[in-house]
């Protein structure tokens, strides 16, 4: 049963009604992109397809995919489908290599985005009565402003904290008594540690009721850790700058069974990450999105590199996405074995003495790749003897070996030894190219 505030009619429309709207909007998007973005005209022509070839949803697979490299190759503004005078805001991705991915928004795009994030917050149980602490970074990154304008559109009171200043953030959470927090899960763990320090222990009695977490993958075990230590319901919000920003999909409070994709604005597909072959709902693969209402920067079959599967709707008509299991481009191949950081995190957080703060380092020793895992002890476990620490190391090595089939070096360090992130956590250091240079 839906328990939160009034839903948008499309959230509970019939599947036929939703698909009719998607078909109508896809026809517009394909035509808009083809007529206004030279890159798309070239790609469609090279593939021998035209927007008129799209008549039903299954026809979308005839059209070529778009990649991050396509957007970078047309840096900065050649992918914009409207004149610059209609672009009211520019964001850029936080990529660490190459040129950033530039995203433009018309006023219509901004309004749609605010409405989508407001809908997401309603799905999380938010209302105009709430105070919402936004700890996503503000600036070119879409997280802070996307969350901010959505919370304002909801009618809530926004606390625009941004990232960083952890001690001050924790103090203001105590002083301002917010009901909801929007933040990356890794930075939330930093805030929890600081709250516990300031409170002299347990932080689960603070005012926060719900946390909306996104911008990086996180495991079910990390969710439970956050919920236990902060006394909240932790929900998953999904988004990416190239498609819109936060709010592409949102987990619903009444089911907490995977983010519902707002399919009236974003059309999802799953493909084989190796050859792009379309996969059926329920099969694991790479997630693609086509925007349905984006004016300034429409994207057609955009390859997110996120690995997941599509699931039937539960609380709403629209389909859900399973929790992201990893990224096809972040996957580590070590001695021919595919390893995802999320797999290792699942094992780490099962240990009662280990915290969720860890780093992975991949090196090359001669001609052989090696994986090292550095993980912090919980503060409550600092009294472990050397022998007990060695035993935990041995157990974690054994768990990882059983799971992925390769041996690892495990180092346990005291709490606070691993640098804390104020945004997305940087957990993987692949030094193979550096060593071989």
From Swiss-Prot:
Its EC number is 6.2.1.30. Induction: Activated by cAMP receptor protein (CRP), integration host factor (IHF) and by phenylacetyl-coenzyme A that prevents PaaX from binding its target sequences. Inhibited by PaaX. Pfam families: AMP-binding, AMP-binding_C_2. Pathway: Aromatic compound metabolism; phenylacetate degradation. It comes from the Bacteria. It catalyses: 2-phenylacetate + ATP + CoA = phenylacetyl-CoA + AMP + diphosphate. SUPFAM superfamilies: Acetyl-CoA synthetase-like. GO terms for biological process: phenylacetate catabolic process. Transmembrane segments: none annotated. The keyword ATP-binding applies. Gene3D superfamilies: 3.30.300.30, N-terminal domain of ligase-like. InterPro entries: Adenylate-forming_Reductase, AMP-bd_C_sf, AMP-dep_Lig_C, AMP-dep_synth/lig_dom, ANL_N_sf, PA_CoA_lig_proteobact_actino, PA_CoA_ligase. GO terms for molecular function: ATP binding; CoA-ligase activity; phenylacetate-CoA ligase activity. Keywords: ATP-binding, Ligase, Nucleotide-binding. Catalyzes the activation of phenylacetic acid (PA) to phenylacetyl-CoA (PA-CoA). Belongs to the phenylacetyl-CoA ligase family. Monomer. This is Phenylacetate-coenzyme A ligase. It comes from Escherichia coli (strain K12).
